[in-house]
């Protein structure tokens, strides 16, 4: 009988050590923000009822809580900077510049804020406009974001973040008009 009890205790200990703790929103933010910041390669696919086929772009991303810079390498060279108050576009080789103030394009601000905050791991800021449900543990996780404020609900259907450890790997943005953008951050 003692052998049976020891075997059961060992099995329970094995299960307890092998199962990681389910993450909370605050823990996921801490995990993501604890990651070293650097540039990341990305591949982004945009699907839309207004496009005859999906459009895929590739390049590098650099993110901070205040800015997301997307340097597109293909299919054409360009740079997008999403700042807190505006979006900037720079054409190939630095030629041609445009900026859009978010005060003049509030719908664009919603999309820019989501992208900027998600890639920076700023879940606390996202929680102001979204209900966030985290699934998984520190090894493999996902976060579902459902809009809850009128401004965001008008633009977005849902957001999904997927990752492993302290690394965001996939950002999926589904817009109300049927558009879907899937951004994969590559190792």
Question: How should each PLM-predicted stretch be described?
Answer:
Residues 123, 127-130, 134-187:
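Gly/Pro-enriched, hydrophobic low-complexity segments
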Residues 55-58, 75-76, 153-158:
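Short, surface-exposed coil-to-beta transition loops
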Residues 95-142:
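Flexible, surface-exposed loop/linker segments and immediately adjacent secondary-structure boundaries
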Residues 1-4:
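N-terminal secretory signal peptides that target proteins for export/translocation
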Residues 58-110, 181:
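An acidic-aromatic
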Residues 42-44, 69-73, 89, 143-149, ...:
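Short beta-strand segments that buttress and anchor functional surface loops
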Residues 18-41, 46-52:
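N-terminal leader/targeting segments and the immediate start of mature chains
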Residues 6-18:
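Bacterial N-terminal signal peptides
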């Amino acid at each position: 009988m003692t052998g049976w009890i020891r075997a059961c205790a060992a099995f329970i200990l094995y299960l307890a050590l092998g199962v990681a703790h389910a993450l909370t929103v605050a823990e996921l933010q801490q995990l993501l923000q604890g990651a070293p910041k650097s540039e990341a390669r990305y591949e982004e696919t945009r699907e839309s009822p207004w496009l005859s086929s999906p459009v895929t772009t590739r390049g590098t991303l650099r993110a901070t809580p205040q800015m997301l810079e997307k340097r597109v390498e293909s299919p054409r060279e360009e740079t997008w900077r999403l700042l807190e108050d505006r979006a900037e576009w720079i054409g190939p080789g630095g030629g041609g510049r445009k900026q859009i103030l978010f005060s003049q394009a509030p719908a664009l601000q919603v999309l820019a804020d989501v992208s900027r905050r998600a890639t920076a791991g700023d879940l606390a800021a996202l929680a102001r406009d979204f209900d966030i449900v985290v699934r998984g543990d520190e090894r493999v996780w996902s976060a579902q974001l459902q809009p809850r404020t009128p401004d965001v609900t008008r633009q977005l259907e849902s957001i999904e973040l997927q990752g492993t450890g302290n690394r965001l790997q996939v950002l999926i943005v589904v817009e109300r008009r049927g558009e879907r953008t899937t951004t994969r951050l590559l190792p």
